[in-house]
Amino acid sequence: AAVLILSGGGLTYAAENGSLAWFFDSLSRETGSVIPSKYVDESYINNEYKGSVKVITESDAKVSFDLKKVAVDGDQVNIAMVITYDDFDTEKYESFDAQMQIIEGGANIVSEYAGSTAPGDGTSLTNKQTMSDIVYKLKKKNAYKVGDVITMRCNSITLFNKNKSSDGAVTYVADEVDGPWTLQFKVQDDMQGHSVDVSGIDGIEKCTINTKGITIDIAENAAVDDDSLENIILEMTDNKELKDVVYGIGKTGDGDSIQRMELNFTKPIDVSQVKNVWIDGRKCKVK
């Protein structure tokens, strides 16, 4: 699945707006996507995670994890967090990232993910912080509900240093900070998923829409143009059409001859205002 890395440089959103507000403003700025505020689910942004997070580690590295959002929808979990690495060398490295796994019984139960990370810009987040907003697809449906405990593991922190060679080519050199860190926390919210009627489109088995994005399941051998799926239009209840609202597009198989297309919104959408989803020029009703 695709992971969009945002530069975050030069942004000046105030910290008091909240980390999620800063993150989505950063994402909108980077992608050029504009979603009118009347269609944005502001409560999803403003209701940051308030529960306790238990962290277990034997690592000496000064790394902390601050959860901002934990929400579920069937076999998907949206987890947004700020990661702070106090010993991050800003002179030597440009950015850092933490690859997280959702685990049960020591085994990874995530089959794919799509989302983005944004390094701190010195205003809303320090330059020793990174924020991620990831939708994880689980290997089993309805694994969690609000109030359930999720266990995540981060085996290491990856540090990225940009190098430019004599021919002008830019490469990224990665170093590792060893963990592992194990996090436990409760599911806070629901992404309010709805099914979308795609019975009129050959090759598409299922489509769902929730606050965070759209999921399209495609039959493995279907002749479906991927580019057409990226050109999603949301028709709202007031007949306004929203275009260019998705990013973080990822596509992988799930082992059942189905390919899943993940399309995340640049800001959380108030799904109650979405009347139809236009896919490849065809109107699909939100149920």
Residue map of PLM features:
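Alpha-helical, hydrophobic structural elements that either
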Residues: 10-287
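Hydrophobic core
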Residues: 4-6
